[in-house]
Amino acid sequence: MSRVGKKLLEIPSDVTVTLNDNNTVAVKGPKGELTRTFHPDMEIKVEDNVLTVARPSDQKEHRALHGTTRSLLGNMVEGVSKGFERGLELVGVGYRASKSGNKLVLNVGYSHPVEIVPEEGIEIEVPSQTKVVVKGTDKERVGAIAANIRAVRSPEPYKGKGIRYEGEVVRRKEGKSAK
């Protein structure tokens, strides 16, 4: 039995979960609404504000899907009730971030500023010139946008310059040693 899959998922009072016939789950809460279609073999039930996921057999595919489905549902419920955020730091001389409308503008050592437009449901905040915070209800989308921002100038191992996640430790290398 999947340790994650057999955990019961308690639904907060301000969140509503609706199940459709083709295993589509819609979760609505104070921060927004998320919808996702799950594998038809997974049995998803809602009883007394508790969400359960069951699998039909112990086949390898069903065992894998069991925990994954439970985790995705848990992230949906957490996303619409609390939301997710991912912090990024800009490290380097002259590296700075700013907002222009809803676009994020990054000056990270290129000859031109890099503009990133967030997709719908994703909010980008710039609390300071060297900090960027990506917020949203969908954990997958928040992580993907944060990864796209980091990929603009990922941290290099010699000086550590670049865009890194908050709390990320960059593995440093020693430069060439002189003879």
UniProtKB/Swiss-Prot annotation:
Subunit structure: Part of the 50S ribosomal subunit.
InterPro entries: Ribosomal_uL6-like, Ribosomal_uL6-like_a/b-dom_sf, Ribosomal_uL6_a/b-dom, Ribosomal_uL6_bac-type, Ribosomal_uL6_CS
PANTHER family: 60S/50S RIBOSOMAL PROTEIN L6/L9, LARGE RIBOSOMAL SUBUNIT PROTEIN UL6M
GO molecular function: rRNA binding; structural constituent of ribosome
Family listed: Belongs to the universal ribosomal protein uL6 family.
Alphabetical list of HAMAP family matching this protein: Ribosomal_uL6_B
This protein's encoding gene: rplF
An annotated GO BP: cytoplasmic translation
Name of the protein described by the UniProt record: Large ribosomal subunit protein uL6
One GO cellular component term noted in the UniProt record for this chain: cytosolic large ribosomal subunit
Keywords: Ribonucleoprotein, Ribosomal protein, RNA-binding, rRNA-binding
Task of the protein: This protein binds to the 23S rRNA, and is important in its secondary structure. It is located near the subunit interface in the base of the L7/L12 stalk, and near the tRNA binding site of the peptidyltransferase center.
SUPFAM superfamilies from the UniProt entry: Ribosomal protein L6
